[in-house]
Amino acid sequence: LKIGEFAPTFTSVKLRACIFLSLVVTFFAMNAEETGSRAIVGGGCFWCVEAVYQTVPGILRVTSGYAGGNVANPTYEQVCTGRTGHAEVVQIEFDPAKISYRQVIDLFWQAHDPTTPNRQGADVGPQYRSIILYENEAEKTAAESSKLEAQAHFKDPIVTEIVPLKTFYPAEKYHQDFYNKNPSYPYSEAVIRPKLEKFEKAVREKGPS
């Protein structure tokens, strides 16, 4: 080597490799936090919210379940007592290239009435409360911002809880894809179908976000 040239050593090469790896890991961690690939919300009976989000482009899968409570692996019967702390919620898996977490949350305000505490129509109890469960600070910020903007469209205060997710518990199999499997069920005809029609009308009138 000529005087002044740097001779790479094993230690320096290893150090640079570690720095590069750290940057790569940080980049992907930040990217995952910004975009996400699922949202968990509750707005009354999960059959209704599930059916609504199944109509949205970019949504890959919607799973009904329970979250926000203090009982592990709750059953539907337990949640219905209102004593588990859980709400009926849906896990919404989406394609971030087609729809963002914020857009998923913006649609939430059209999917239910967020101004009625512990109630959606005739469904009454804490398990039917309006709730958004976030998994990181980026989701929390997006949810709070969306809620703040949505308030301008409601006369009464929005009572939606925005809380960190602990665990999402999928509901029993017979609850999954309920409306599509049971379109003639009395609840489907009396509650879910009108809510779907109202949602689709509201989205059309609002236009693309």
What kind of region is each of these model predictions?
Residues E5-I19:
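Bacterial N-terminal signal peptides that target proteins for export
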Residues T9, L21-L23, A202:
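Enrichment for repetitive, rod-forming helical segments
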Residues A17-F27:
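Bacterial N-terminal signal peptides
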Residues F28-S209:
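Flexible coil/turn and secondary-structure edge motifs
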